[in-house]
Every structure is written in structure tokens, then in C-alpha cells.
């Protein structure tokens, strides 16, 4: 049967060619003579594809069947039609020929890299990738690396199908896919901003992959989380691009199952030695994020963060050059550092006492030398510095008093060691802060009631933050001027706190720092609630009156119904009987002035 079919097809082809030659000799141009054989040739390649498919589908396994699959790979680059159809046949029989899989993947890669303008051809090749990896996950790592480079394309359709293929690969094997993404980022040595392919990949990871990772790995095994955390930390140590750093820290936040001491060990081993030689801005950004990571696992007040290398970077790299930072970066740095001071050990915290106080003096001038109106203070920075100063001073009050010139009256000879010059200098800065904060506090209180419009939400938030920071500054300064200084800040929440729960407490719940209009609204709500409760009680009482009357009538009927009849003479005889020991008590009601029916429980002996 096969021989007959082949002969018939050849004859038909020959007849067609003869007819074409006859027509070309009479009317056809040379252009027509070159087009027609190409159409026939395309039909031959397509028919060959389907003939091979029929043979492979008919027999699951037979000798030399790999030659047929090799023929499919060979024909894939012949014409445009075969380029469009070959991914379909390659993906269908890919699993059946493991020895030819590498060759088939190279064929698909050639279709990706083809300079042909036909987008459909490349889209078909992209669609075949998840299919061939569904039963062969060993090729995922290689294909993820290749597809990551193809994201930077001018065709939106092609870029969208590339993203879909990467997402499908992630769903097939998330561990291998995510590890391949990290390997791709690790291979990039230069800045991500200078390489469009890497920038496109970072954007794709942020929009599509990180939400999937956050959902899947929130409750994964500790071993898996540790593996990825170590990999990401090593990438962070080498990275200098702001865009890549933001992405890596977002990815690091997806793996939340870790302990403080384990993280400190990883930082001191793999990260901190590498970043010492980097720029000030890079060190600042990394230190802030590392400090936040440690703080989120150290929410308890007495949890210590014992990392000498981490705080050495603050002491030697950051504080000497902190004034070189712009206002926004300086505010963020000082705020985060102040929140970690309660978790420092006493040995580490004493190293920061003088640098923090010197930075405070450089930020806040003295009233004796500078008019209040001439200085525009950054209250968030001042609040954070005072918070850090109180926190560090609580670990050694004597060191704080010696630094600021406070005089402690203890009856000991050391009372005479106070430095009056230092104390007067501190008092001058206190007077400056007191006047400046009270002036700003009054402005904030007046502004908040007028910011009820939803459009003024940002201004309202800023006014609330200013109100809180000025109140905190006044509270801390007043406590420091007491004898002895009060340095307890456990119940104090600074305006720049990194904990979202405490931020909500500041703006919505906290009665200490709530604006006046919120207090007034709260009082009105309480009054309305009491009135409503009183109204409900009255309604309930009115509903119970008929029920009580009915119960009284029923009780009276029962008492009359079962009480035996006693003649009047018998009743007087009972009253005239000699009384036994005890006292007879008569109860009279206030309304009717009649004896009550209550007779007590037996004779009473008084």
C-alpha cells in the first residue's frame, strides 16, 4: 500500500510539473516559474511532518524510530511553514527520545534567536517550552537562563509569551526556577542599570515572581528557606545597584523563618566583610535593611542583638560621615539606628554614647548663641537622637550624667565632679528645643482640625507625625532634666517606627498622642453610647412591667386558692395563745402601711 501511494504522488507531481512547464513556455514569466515549485516543496515538507507523525503514533516503539525524530529536527529550519509547525511536533515526541533532547532544545533555541520577522514562529517555540519541561524538569535551569535573556524584546506579544512560559516553568518546579533566576543575577557583574536585559528581568521578578514566592514559601521547610536566604545574602553582599538591591531585599523578606543569631552569623560570615570597601550610600542602604531584618525578629524588649561587626560599620563608616548624607537618607538612617539601641549589649552601647551626643549637639543649637526663629529643625532626627541617647544612657546612668554634666545628689564625694559648663550647654539646647517644640506643637494642633478633606490626607499624616515627634522630644528632655535622670523609654513610640502595628496605634488608637479633635469625637461617642444604653434599659423595663404584674396576680391566685378556710374565732384564739420564746416581728410596707405577708422561716431567737 505504501508503494502504491508513493508512486501515485510522484506521478501527480510529475504531471503537475509538465503542466507548469507547458504553461510557462507559452504565457508564464520567469517569476511565475520560480514561485510554483516552492509552494509544492512546502507541501512536501508539511506532508512529511504528518507522515512521520502517523508512523510514530501507530507504533509506540520500533527500530530506527529516532531517525524519524531527527528528520523532524532537520526539517524545522527549511521553510517558514516548517518553522511554525516544528515546535508542535518536537514538543509532542520530546519525551520519547531522551538521546535527542539536547538537539531538540538547540533547535528551539535557534528558532528563538532567528532573525526572521515572523513573530508567530517564535511564539510557537515559546509555547513548546513548558510542554517539554513538564515531564523533563532537568532542562528547566538551562531554559530559564535562556528565556531570561529573551525578555528584552521589542515585540509586546513575544515578551508576554516569554513571561508566561517563565511563570509556567516556576509552577512546574519553583525551587529550580528560582535558583536559576538567582544564578542569572549572580552572573551579572556590572550594574543592573547598564544592562537592559537584566533590568527587564528585575521588573518581571518584582511584578510576577515575588508574589508567587511570598505565597508558596511562607510556610516552607526551614532547610529550603535557609538555602535561599544564604544565596540571596551572598548576592546582596556583591550587589551595588539600587534597583537590584531593592528587589533582593524584597525577595529576602519572603523567607521569614529564621532566628536572630543565625542571621547574625550569616551576615558576619558572608556579607559584612564584603561591603566594608563599598561606597557610603551602598553601605548605608544595606545596613538599614539588615538592621530592620534583625529588629523584626527582636520585638521583645530584652532581646539582644550581639553583632560587633554590624555595629562597627555604624561606628567607623557611618557616624563619621553621617553629615555627608542628604536629609532623607540621614533621617532614615538615624531613625532605624535609634530603634536598635534598646537591643544593644551594654558593652556595644557605651561605644555609641559620645558619638550620638555629639551628633545631637551638631543638630540642635544652643539658645544662648542662636535665635530660635533662625533654625528649621528636623524634629524626626532630633527625636531619634534623644531616643537613642536615653536608651543608651539607661544602661549606664553615671556615664550619661558625666557626659552631659548632670549633678547627682547622692551624698558621696563624687557629687562635686559635675561639670557646670557641660550642664549649662545642655540646658541651653534644652531651652532652644522647648521653645521651638512648643511653637511647632501649637501650629500642628491648630492645623489638624482643618485637614478633614480626603485630599489633605498627606498633610494630615505629616501634621500628626510632627505632633507626636514634638511631644516625644518634650517628654524625653523633661525626663533627662530630673534628678536623677529618667531614661525609661519602654512605653514610648517614636514617630518613625518601622513596625506597622505601632504606626496604626499612633494615628488611630493611642490616647496619649491623639489630636484634640479625635479626643472630642471619642468623648461624643462615649456619651452617645451611654445614652443609648440608658434608652435600652428603659425600654426593657417598660416591657417587663406587664410581665411582673401578671406574675404577681398568678402568685396571689395560687395563695388564695390553696389557703384553707379559717373561722374568725379560731384566728383570734390562735393570736391569744401564749407565745413561745422569741420575738414576733411585723413588717409594714411603705406604700399601704399594712403588715406584709412575709412570716419568716421558723421562730427567731434573738
Swiss-Prot record:
One of its GO terms (molecular function) is RNA binding. InterPro entries: API5, ARM-like, ARM-type_fold. GO terms for cellular component: nucleus. Residues 1-13, 537-564 have a biased composition (Low complexity). Keywords: Apoptosis. Residues 1-30, 537-606 are annotated as: Disordered. It comes from the Eukaryota. Residues 571-593 have a biased composition (Basic and acidic residues). GO terms for biological process: negative regulation of apoptotic process. Belongs to the API5 family. May be an antiapoptotic factor. This is Apoptosis inhibitor 5 homolog. The lineage of its organism: Eukaryota, Amoebozoa, Evosea, Eumycetozoa, Dictyostelia. The gene is api5.
Amino acid at each position: 500500500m505504501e508503494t502504491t501511494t508513493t508512486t501515485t504522488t510522484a506521478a501527480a507531481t510529475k504531471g503537475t510539473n509538465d503542466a507548469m512547464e507547458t504553461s510557462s513556455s507559452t504565457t508564464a514569466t520567469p517569476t511565475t516559474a520560480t514561485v510554483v515549485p516552492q509552494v509544492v516543496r512546502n507541501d512536501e515538507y508539511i506532508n512529511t511532518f504528518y507522515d512521520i507523525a502517523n508512523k510514530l503514533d501507530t507504533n509506540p516503539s520500533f527500530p530506527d524510530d529516532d531517525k524519524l525524530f531527527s528528520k523532524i529536527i532537520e526539517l524545522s529550519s527549511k521553510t517558514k511553514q516548517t518553522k511554525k509547525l516544528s515546535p508542535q511536533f518536537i514538543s509532542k515526541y520530546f519525551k520519547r527520545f531522551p538521546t535527542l533532547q539536547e538537539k531538540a532544545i538547540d533547535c528551539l533555541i535557534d528558532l528563538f534567536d532567528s532573525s526572521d520577522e515572523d513573530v508567530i514562529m517564535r511564539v510557537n517555540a515559546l509555547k513548546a517550552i513548558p510542554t517539554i519541561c513538564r515531564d523533563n524538569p532537568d532542562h528547566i535551569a538551562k531554559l530559564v537562563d535562556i528565556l531570561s535573556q529573551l525578555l528584552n524584546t521589542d515585540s509586546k506579544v513575544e515578551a508576554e509569551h516569554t513571561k508566561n512560559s517563565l511563570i509556567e516553568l516556576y509552577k512546574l518546579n519553583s525551587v529550580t526556577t528560582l535558583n536559576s533566576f538567582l544564578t542569572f543575577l549572580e552572573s551579572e557583574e556590572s550594574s543592573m542599570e547598564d544592562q537592559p536585559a537584566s533590568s527587564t528581568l528585575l521588573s518581571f521578578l518584582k511584578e510576577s515572581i515575588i508574589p508567587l514566592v511570598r505565597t508558596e514559601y511562607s510556610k516552607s521547610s526551614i532547610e529550603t528557606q535557609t538555602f535561599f536566604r544564604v544565596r540571596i545574602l551572598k548576592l546582596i553582599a556583591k550587589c551595588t545597584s539600587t534597583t537590584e538591591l531593592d528587589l533582593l531585599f524584597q525577595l529576602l523578606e519572603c523567607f521569614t523563618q529564621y532566628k536572630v543569631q543565625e542571621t547574625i552569623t550569616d551576615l558576619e560570615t558572608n556579607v559584612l566583610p564584603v561591603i566594608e570597601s563599598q561606597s557610603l550610600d551602598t553601605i548605608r542602604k544595606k545596613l538599614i535593611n539588615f538592621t530592620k531584618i534583625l529588629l523584626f525578629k527582636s520585638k521583645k524588649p530584652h532581646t539582644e542583638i550581639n553583632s560587633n561587626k554590624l555595629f562597627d560599620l555604624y561606628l567607623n563608616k557611618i557616624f563619621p560621615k553621617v553629615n555627608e548624607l542628604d536629609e532623607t537618607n540621614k533621617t532614615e538612617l538615624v531613625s532605624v539606628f535609634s530603634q536598635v539601641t534598646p537591643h544593644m549589649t551594654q558593652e556595644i552601647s557605651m561605644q555609641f554614647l559620645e558619638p550620638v551626643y555629639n551628633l545631637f549637639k551638631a543638630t540642635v543649637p544652643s539658645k544662648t548663641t542662636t535665635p530660635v526663629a533662625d533654625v528649621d529643625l528636623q524634629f524626626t532626627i532630633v527625636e531619634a537622637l534623644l531616643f537613642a541617647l536615653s536608651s543608651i544612657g539607661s544602661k549606664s546612668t553615671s556615664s550619661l550624667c558625666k557626659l552631659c554634666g548632670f549633678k547627682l545628689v547622692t551624698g558621696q564625694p563624687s557629687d562635686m565632679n559635675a561639670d557646670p559648663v557641660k550642664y549649662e550647654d545642655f540646658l541651653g539646647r534644652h531651652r532652644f528645643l522647648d521653645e521651638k517644640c512648643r511653637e511647632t506643637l501649637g501650629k500642628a494642633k491648630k492645623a489638624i482640625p482643618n485637614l478633614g478633606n480626603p485630599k489633605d490626607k498627606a498633610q494630615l499624616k505629616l501634621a500628626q507625625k510632627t505632633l507626636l515627634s514634638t511631644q516625644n522630644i518634650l517628654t524625653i528632655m523633661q525626663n533627662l532634666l530630673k534628678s536623677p535622670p529618667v531614661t525609661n523609654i519602654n512605653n514610648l513610640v517614636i514617630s518613625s517606627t518601622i513596625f506597622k502595628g505601632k504606626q496604626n496605634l499612633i494615628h488611630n488608637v493611642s490616647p496619649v498622642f491623639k489630636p484634640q479633635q479625635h479626643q472630642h469625637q471619642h468623648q461624643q461617642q462615649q456619651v452617645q453610647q451611654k445614652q443609648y444604653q440608658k434608652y435600652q434599659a428603659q425600654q426593657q423595663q417598660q416591657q417587663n412591667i406587664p410581665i411582673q404584674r401578671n406574675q404577681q396576680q398568678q402568685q396571689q391566685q395560687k395563695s388564695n386558692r390553696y389557703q384553707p378556710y379559717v373561722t374568725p374565732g379560731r384566728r383570734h384564739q390562735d393570736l391569744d395563745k401564749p407565745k413561745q420564746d422569741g420575738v414576733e416581728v411585723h413588717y409594714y410596707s411603705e406604700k399601704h402601711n399594712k403588715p406584709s405577708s412575709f412570716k419568716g422561716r421558723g421562730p427567731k431567737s434573738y
